[in-house]
Amino acid sequence: DKGMFFTSLITPAILLVLYATFLGNIYKDSFLSSMPEGFTLAEDLINGLVGGQLMSSILAVSCVTVAFSSNMLMVQDKANGTIKDLSISPVKKSTLALSYYFATLISTLIICYVALAICLLYVSFIGWFISFADVMFLMLDVFLLVMFGTALSSIINFFLSSQGQIAAVGTIMSAGYGFICGAYMPISSFSSGLQKVVSFLPGTYGTSLVRNHSMN
């Protein structure tokens, strides 16, 4: 779906505007309130720190949620019966599964790398303190997270067979994943029991990986 693909390319820019508008001041106030009285930092340094946190939040969430949206094709093929045509063709099931995986991986990588470029451009305007090595690490982080997001969406979508089911799962992932992985709120603010639960989720470590390189 070319229309959906090009619309998805615009989504990171919209997300960045929303994050910077609503979360930027929250992050900034949080940093300022945690500093000792009488201790000050340069404005561009604080802005760079906030920008790095916003960038890590967007990338950590997008790499997984975009993968779910990209992988909707697998469920759509089940819903409209296309999978039956593919099943009777001389193609192994493993080849078909890998085709869905790599198609989702490639489209998600394109969108997420566009998101990374937009985020880096935003950070360059408000306060750039990221080294070239960290930029390379961020590109690697995005690749790893997209592989994880694609694998997770493939596993979950394997059990879905209707448009309603994928819409419900997509809504849940879009609304809840950012909180579960620690992108919107620091895991330290969760209760001790919830902290132990989310520590078993790979997504939390992916968020930490991106945040470490974007705020280094």
Predicted regions and their residues:
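Transmembrane helix boundary and interhelical loop/hinge segments in multi-pass membrane proteins
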Residues: 67-91
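Short hydrophobic alpha-helical segments within the ABC transporter permease transmembrane module
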Residues: 6, 10, 82-83, 96-105
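Perimembrane loop-to-helix junctions flanking transmembrane segments
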Residues: 30-46
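Alpha-helical transmembrane segments and their short interhelical loops
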Residues: 93, 101-178
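Hydrophobic alpha-helical transmembrane segments of multi-pass membrane transport/permease proteins
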Residues: 2-30, 51-66, 109-112, 172-178
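Residue-level recognition of membrane-helix boundary sites in multi-pass small-molecule transporters
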Residues: 3-4, 95, 165, 196
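Hydrophobic alpha-helical transmembrane segments of membrane proteins
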Residues: 45-76, 141, 151
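Transmembrane helix segments
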Residues: 18-28, 157-213
